[in-house]
Amino acid sequence: MGRIRSRVGGTRNLIFIGALLVLMLVLLLDIYVEDKIFEPLGYFYLFFAILVVFYGVYPLYVNRRLTKYYWDRTKRHWLSVFGLIFIIFLIVVALIGPFLTQDPTEVNFLRKNLPPVSFSTQQSVYDLEAEKFVTRDTPGVWQHPLGTDDKGRDMLAMLVSGARVSLQVGLLATLIAIIIGTVVGVLSAYLGGWADNVLMRFTDIMMTFPFFLLLVFIIFIFGPSLAFIILAIGLTGWTGTARLVRSEALSLRTREFIMASKSLGASDARIIFRHLIPNVLSSIIVIATLSIPGIILAEAALSFIGLGDPTVTSWGVVLNAGQRSLDTAWWVAVEPGIVLFLTVLAFNFLGDGIRDAFDPRSQL
């Protein structure tokens, strides 16, 4: 059985490396073509998707008995099931939605401030025959089912574009923060001594800075690029993960299987990657799931106050535009607010369900 698992794991690693090579080849080709296949952040998004498929979904498929056990515990919380369904729907929309909707940056002042379908609003329009502005009842149209903003941009297209931006920021920044926090926490617990003191004191110093104000300061200095926003959030949001992983790893460091591995001559790297990290993985998954909504909110808040990337259409940008016209076009602010609220709620529900599923002490 051990040989079979080792062989399956080796095959998975080879296929994963092959997929990364194909992705790198497409990236190199994309540099020299005029019509880009993906935007730069799209490649990071694809890398994350490949990583999740090979090291998240595939292990669940192989170990079906354990997967069924965790799924049975998770699905007892109907709110966590709702969160999972909504997140899957959001991911599908973010992936294929931009190919089915209009250009979110296309401006058409002839169709500005159109309400959603089934709603109507009073608008002042210019009558060419009377040669003056008149007030007319303007209904919603199916060409723009969720309405348009004050520049005539399609709200559905902007919400879909915002979903992609929010998921890119949430997933990639969380990945960066989780990797840094896991490395710091595991090394601090395993090495102990002066290394533990240095790493934890540095973590304490990072935690003393207000997270959002630190983000505002960094982005104000270096500029509001979306890639830099992701990097800034990831580099400043790892402290909670580090402390949690350290506490879990400290309880494992003196366990019998760790001591047995040391006595058999296993290297420190092997002990860390084969024993420590796999045994704290459940806690890492929980904190990652619960960190994503906070990161999505942070990006939306940065965009709302004007520190987001002006070249992308995010929910925070749409909210900023909508709050200036609440009296005439309420849907411009309400729709992205509802989607943002549901997204944050879904990730929190899913995180709570996963936490209860992984916790053997929970009463279900």
What kind of feature is each model-predicted range?
Residues 1-178, 182, 322-346, 354-364:
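Gly/Trp-centered helix-boundary motif
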